[in-house]
């Protein structure tokens, strides 16, 4: 296992933990997802269990997909490449999704600052960016070491 793959898996696990903590905070504080102002979540638990997510977490189906991709990334060969490519994509998607939430501006404003929400938001965004960057590095390493066929 390469160093970049180890770091990618660590970033993914960190992201999963951050999303779980984000879900707990969202349920406690009624933080509905409102990506770009057009999701308008109504029921946080239902939104989390389906495909909307919360203001501080991705939806459960996406987290389960991320968990599966993380496990795949640890496997050799084609399965591992699928896992790495998937985590790279998930990192890009989560970065855009989290930064598109209005809570980003509210949490970092003096009047709306909440330390727990700010930490979870930072962990989620930083780990998603890390997944994207480390996914690219790992993908390049895997491609360079793959035997050429043809």
Which residues make up each language-model segment?
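Cytosolic juxtamembrane helix and N-cap/initiation of the first transmembrane helix
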Residues: 1-28, 137-143, 150
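Hydrophobic transmembrane helix segments
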Residues: 14-60
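Alpha-helical transmembrane segments of polytopic membrane proteins
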Residues: 46-66, 114-128
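Interfacial segments of alpha-helical transmembrane regions
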Residues: 3-17, 75-91
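Hydrophobic alpha-helical transmembrane segments of integral membrane proteins
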Residues: 85-118
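Small-residue packing motifs within transmembrane alpha-helices
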Residues: 7-8, 62-64, 79-81, 87-88, ...
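Juxtamembrane helix-break-helix junctions at the cytosolic face
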Residues: 66-85, 139-142
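Membrane-water interface at the C-terminal end of transmembrane alpha helices
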Residues: 122-146
